Amino acid sequence: MDLKNLTQEERSELSLIDVAHFILEQRKETILFPELVKEIQAFLGLKDAEIRERLVQFYTDMNIDGNFISLGNNTWGLRAWYPMDAIDEEVQTQTTPKKKRKSDDDDDEDEEILDDDVDYDDEEIVEELGEEEISLADVLLDEDEDDDDHLPDGIEGDLATVEDDYTDGDYTEDPEDK
């Protein structure tokens, strides 16, 4: 089909993909994407704002459509120009890292480290380090200090505080409660 013979009204009904395919067939060579967009804009007589609105969808359609191929560096061509064996598309394969096997052999260094370990439960070693053993009998807590710091917990503590506020007789009933 020759799109050059179409009227402007018929051209406006064409999709950008159809026009891009026509332009690439006529040129018979690859084209940079911005140049392709300019030629489509000129062919369809679109304004800059109109082409900008449709540009994202057009680029997506070109990637999805099986007739076009991206050759890198934003250069596009028709897939029909290239035999299947000649297409060198980048195929990304996921490589999973190989798991390292745990070594079953024991190193001599491990045994040396175990021999050098210090047992801190041994009283002789504690004395060598200059530390003193402290027993609970040596440290007595003063019970009087705890009474001052103790506050009732939960809602009982809140209620006790409310009762304390009104014990001096200043409390009068609210007339709205009657």
UniProtKB/Swiss-Prot annotation:
- Domain of life, per the record? Bacteria
From the UniProt entry, list the residue stretches annotated as the region Disordered: 89-122, 141-178
A cellular component annotation (GO) from this entry: DNA-directed RNA polymerase complex
Q: Does the keyword Transferase apply?
A: yes
Indicate, by first and last residue, each region the UniProt record lists as having compositional bias (Acidic residues).
Answer: 105-122, 141-150, 161-178
Q: Which GO terms describe its molecular function?
A: DNA-directed RNA polymerase activity
Q: Which UniProt keywords apply?
A: DNA-directed RNA polymerase, Nucleotidyltransferase, Transcription, Transferase
Q: Does the keyword DNA damage apply?
A: no
GO BP terms: DNA-templated transcription; regulation of DNA-templated transcription
Give all residue intervals belonging to the HTH HARE-type domain. 14-81
State the oligomer form and interacting partners.
RNAP is composed of a core of 2 alpha, a beta and a beta' subunits. The core is associated with a delta subunit and one of several sigma factors.
Its annotated function is as follows: Participates in both the initiation and recycling phases of transcription. In the presence of the delta subunit, RNAP displays an increased specificity of transcription, a decreased affinity for nucleic acids, and an increased efficiency of RNA synthesis because of enhanced recycling.
| Family assignment from sequence similarity | Belongs to the RpoE family.
This protein is called: Probable DNA-directed RNA polymerase subunit delta
Q: What is the organism lineage in this UniProt record?
A: Bacteria, Bacillati, Bacillota, Bacilli, Bacillales
Gene name per UniProt:
rpoE
